[in-house]
């Protein structure tokens, strides 16, 4: 399955590939096979910034990266390296335990500063971005870590929660969060179900990828068909099958 997907996805979405005969094919994505960094960059281009008035940093999901880097071990290792280098942040989106959002650190910093500008919690947020963000790449933070290591008072932590920079994980523990991401999560969950339903309603519960992408998206698919298809493939919610007519998406047998 991985081998098939590795060859199918660049063919369908995105590599300008020169053949021995025939014209050069051009597709929306042009990621470099095997590079998580390139995959993240290309997927970021699909994020509809205008939908959120550019208030959110572009967000892609780990599952989407798997659609372009099908070897999950390689993808996870490369993402971990980017995380340790401070280039990306990974956040828990909350609607699923495996729902990890990936954001470029500089985009995150810029949008958060803009969102808190002039607010009562701006000082706490600036302190967090200057001290915690560069030093700790974790998805969550513990109370002793915040108070003893980074010197935050309880009131400052409350400010960070109010600002949407942290969300409560459990008593004395917080997830890193993206201010204002609730609307994105709502759109993502509804859009995923809608695109999955398009495949489910097709004859034999299968649909050519080219046909799916050529259809008019349902109103609830606010993030775009291509954005969601990468998720469905990478999350293994559909199987990819090579046919003479192109890549076929089929719901797995249950």
UniProtKB/Swiss-Prot annotation:
GO cellular component, one term: nuclear speck
Result after altering residue 204 to E: Reduces self-association and DNA-binding activity. Increases cytoplasmic localization
Keyword DNA-binding part of the UniProt annotation: yes
GO BP term (any one): positive regulation of Ras protein signal transduction
Keywords: Cytoplasm, DNA damage, DNA repair, DNA-binding, Nucleus, Repeat, RNA-binding
Tissue specificity field: Monocytes, hepatocytes, epithelial cells, T- and B-lymphocytes.
Motif Bipartite nuclear localization signal mapped to chain: 4-21
Its biological purpose: DNA-binding protein which is required for efficient transcription-coupled nucleotide excision repair (TC-NER). Acts as part of a TC-NER complex which assembles and interacts with RNA polymerase II (RNAPII) when it stalls at DNA lesions. TC-NER complex subunit UVSSA binds to the GTF2H1/p62 subunit of the TFIIH transcription factor complex, tethering TFIIH to the TC-NER complex. WHR1/STK19 then interacts with the XPD helicase subunit of TFIIH which guides TFIIH to DNA downstream of the stalled RNAPII, ensuring DNA repair. Directly interacts with RNAPII and also binds to downstream DNA.
Name the record gives this protein: Winged helix repair factor 1
Gene: WHR1
Region (Winged helix domain 2): 120-179
Induction per the UniProt record: By ultraviolet radiation (at protein level).
Pfam families cross-referenced by the UniProt entry: Stk19
Residue ranges, annotated region (Winged helix domain 3): 180-254
Top-level division of the source organism's lineage: Eukaryota
Winged helix domain 1: annotated segments: 32-104
The protein's assembly and partners: Monomer in solution. Homodimer; when bound to DNA. Component of a transcription-coupled nucleotide excision repair (TC-NER) complex composed of STK19, ERCC6, ERCC8, DDA1, DDB1, ELOF1 and UVSSA which assembles and interacts with the multiprotein RNA polymerase II complex when it stalls at DNA lesions.
Family classification: Belongs to the STK19 family.
């Amino acid at each position: 399955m991985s081998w098939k997907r590795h060859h199918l996805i660049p063919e369908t979405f995105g590599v300008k590939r020169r053949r021995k005969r025939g014209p050069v094919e051009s597709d929306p994505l042009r990621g470099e096979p095997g590079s998580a960094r390139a995959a993240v960059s290309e997927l970021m281009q699909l994020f509809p910034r205008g939908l959120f008035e550019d208030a959110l940093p572009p967000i892609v999901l780990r599952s989407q990266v798997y659609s372009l880097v099908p070897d999950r071990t390689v993808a996870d290792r490369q993402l971990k390296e980017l995380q340790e280098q401070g280039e990306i942040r990974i956040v828990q989106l909350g609607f699923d335990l495996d729902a990890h959002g990936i954001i470029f650190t500089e985009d995150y910093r810029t949008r958060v500063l803009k969102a808190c500008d002039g607010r009562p919690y701006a000082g706490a947020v600036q302190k967090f971005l200057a001290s915690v963000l560069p030093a700790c790449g974790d998805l969550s933070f513990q109370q002793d870590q915040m108070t003893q290591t980074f010197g935050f008072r309880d009131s400052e932590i409350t400010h960070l929660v109010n600002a949407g920079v942290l969300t409560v994980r459990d008593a004395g523990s917080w997830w890193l969060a993206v201010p204002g991401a609730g609307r994105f999560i709502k759109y993502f969950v509804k859009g995923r179900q809608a695109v999955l339903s398009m495949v489910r309603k097709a004859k034999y519960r299968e649909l050519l990828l080219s046909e799916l992408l050529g259809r008019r998206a349902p109103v609830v698919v606010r993030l775009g068909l291509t954005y969601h298809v990468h998720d469905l493939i990478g999350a293994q919610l559909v199987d990819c099958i090579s046919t003479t007519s192109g890549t076929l998406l089929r719901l797995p047998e249950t």
